[in-house]
Amino acid sequence: MSDLTDIQEEITRHEQQLVVARQKLKDAERAVEVYPDDVNKNTLQARQQTVSALEDKLADYKRRMADAVSRKKMDTKPTDPTGIEPDDHLKERSSLRYGNVLDVNAIDIEEPSGQTADWYTIGVYVIGFTIPIILKALYMLSTRGRQTVKENKGTRIRFKDDTSFEDINGIRRPKHLYVSMPTAQSTMKAEELTPGRFRTIVCGLFPTQIQVRNIMSPVMGVIGFSFFVKDWPEKIREFMEKECPFIKPEVKPGTPAQEVEFLKRNRVYFMTRQDVLDKNHVADIDKLIDYAASGDPTSPDDIESPNAPWVFACAPDRCPPTCIYVAGMAELGAFFSILQDMRNTIMASKTVGTAEEKLKKKSSFYQSYLRRTQSMGIQLDQRIILLYMLEWGKEMVDHFHLGDDMDPELRGLAQSLIDQKVKEISNQEPLKI
């Protein structure tokens, strides 16, 4: 509907309807105050929905009106015979044609897209919901994340569950969990939840619940995360007791041999790392940790906690703030991100194509994780990541899922049968299984 007259008529009609609807809403509110029965409550809810729908439609028509006026101005603008726009500063026409007009009115430069999120506000918002809706939303944004993002890109979605509701004047209403699904051009507010921020905060707050329900992101499944977390307490305990190549203790004469051996262990290096982290706290993250400690969240306070690796089960894009001051946790996430890059490099290497096509299939999970985590105020200890790689790198690579689980003999036999049948029914080249 591009005609200005028609749009103006629709705006006038909807404004009149909105006046009537708001009056009916006031009457319904008074009726509920006098007789708060189910009939009046349902009527009130219906009136509220009607007003909301009319307001949305009116706003849409006003946007259309603004667009139509803008287009009309552009159409009536006199064109310069030289082909130069009237406000262009060039004296002669450029060799480049004029492209799109990029509208930057919606961008707030006080809150650039690369900013650090307001983790305290985000954490308080998420903790205010029931566990079921949080975990179901996490499942939709991790296990089924690619599909959910694809279907809802560029919108602000609402998760709804019967366990999440609030009572307003005796009326039970759904309490929606809002998550923004940005595009590359979107500018996010500091307190706005995106899929990446949601996975980060929920993984950090509720790793035990995630472990019990075995919620896992596909990108973690294919690097053998299930194998890694099996017998984690024993695995990390053995790791801590091994000799650390980066420690050379200054031993005084007469020191017992047992104490000398202890001072060379990984555990001592982690204790030193913990001392460094304890001096680098950020006030907002400390507030979040204190707030979380007073409620249901189960954030690990030690790398040896049984639920510690489950913080990364849903592939958060940085170390969750609730465990960023636990020695070795941020580095464990970096170790997982390197494994993801290693698997993608293997997959890219075995595919057929040019070197450029193969490079496109590589990833940079590690660089992204490193940048995002360090923006939260800590520097990762590369030596700890190296210790993890030396200890578990080989066995993790052996447990990668590389999409080639078929036995070579079985594959060869199946391919020969395919080739034979294709030759019988056509003269086309058979595809590879």
Swiss-Prot record:
Name of this chain's protein: Nucleoprotein
UniProt-annotated stretches for the region Chaperone activity: 1-100
Assembly behavior: Homotrimer. Homomultimer. Homomultimerizes and binds to viral genomic RNA to form the nucleocapsid. Interacts with host MAP1LC3B; this interaction participates to the protection of Gn from virus-triggered autophagy. Interacts with host SNAP29; this interaction participates to the protection of glycoprotein N from virus-triggered autophagy. Interacts (via N-terminus) with host RPS19; this interaction probably mediates the loading of the 40S ribosomal subunit on viral capped mRNA during N-mediated translation initiation. Interacts with the viral RdRp. Interacts with host SUMO1 (via N-terminus).
Disordered, as annotated region: 69-90
Protein keywords: Capsid protein, Chaperone, Coiled coil, Endonuclease, Helical capsid protein, Host cytoplasm, Host Golgi apparatus, Hydrolase, Nuclease, Ribonucleoprotein, RNA-binding, Viral nucleoprotein, Virion
Biased composition range(s): Basic and acidic residues: 69-78
Region of interest: Interaction with host DAXX: 377-433
Region (Viral RNA-binding), start-end ranges: 175-217
Chief site of localization: virion
Lineage of source species: Viruses, Riboviria, Orthornavirae, Negarnaviricota, Polyploviricotina
Location of the protein in the cell: Virion; Host cytoplasm, Host perinuclear region; Host Golgi apparatus, Host cis-Golgi network
Annotated site, Important for the endonuclease activity, chain positions: 88, 103
Domain of life, per lineage: Viruses
Region of interest called Homomultimerization, as start-end residue ranges on this chain: 1-79, 100-125, 377-425
Coiled coil spans: 4-71
Region (Interaction with glycoprotein N): 80-248
Functional summary from the UniProt entry: Encapsidates the genome protecting it from nucleases. The encapsidated genomic RNA is termed the nucleocapsid (NC) and serves as template for transcription and replication. The nucleocapsid has a left-handed helical structure. As a trimer, specifically binds and acts as a chaperone to unwind the panhandle structure formed by the viral RNA (vRNA) termini. Involved in the transcription and replication initiation of vRNA by mediating primer annealing. Plays a role in cap snatching by sequestering capped RNAs in P bodies for use by the viral RdRp during transcription initiation.
Region of interest called Interaction with host UBE2I/UBC9, as start-end residue ranges on this chain: 188-191
Family: Belongs to the hantavirus nucleocapsid protein family.
